[in-house]
């Protein structure tokens, strides 16, 4: 049986980050494998890879080529590697040269509210699936409202939030906090506010770390 308080896991990530989707799936599999041994509570913290992205988004291949100075062939190779990692975790990545990258700030605002309602994990999974598997525009209010409903949230309240600046200040404050703590890349998984696990690690790496931190807690 698990002992003591549940581990606090702060998962810093962006909705448009494929390695964040892989990292979350790995973390969740690790926690499932450790059921009865380790208990934990996941909290999602916001990080925007492209905070200046316009509302219409941008072709993802062109964006990655310009941002990282790589070729279209290298983008394709990276996607193939991500697809393979995803398949092993049951995550379907259907990205291609027509995929687009979108602004994710409103998605982060909804996620902040969803945690207050206890539905943040369901919404996060819905957002990742919509973007990476279905190719949906996760900046579009209609998409966000549909996903909020799928996650068991009140869509009327979600619509009010999206039509206002609700939780914008809170999201900005959290983004700034984790930047001040040195988080420059995501995913970043922080255990009990002290231990950092960087990147989309495989489940066994999370298992080992979580078991170690739980024993030391």
Report each predicted region and the residues it spans.
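Structural alpha/beta surface segment adjacent to cysteine/selenocysteine redox centers
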Residues: 24-131
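C-terminal cap of thioredoxin/glutaredoxin-like
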Residues: 3-36, 40, 44, 111-217
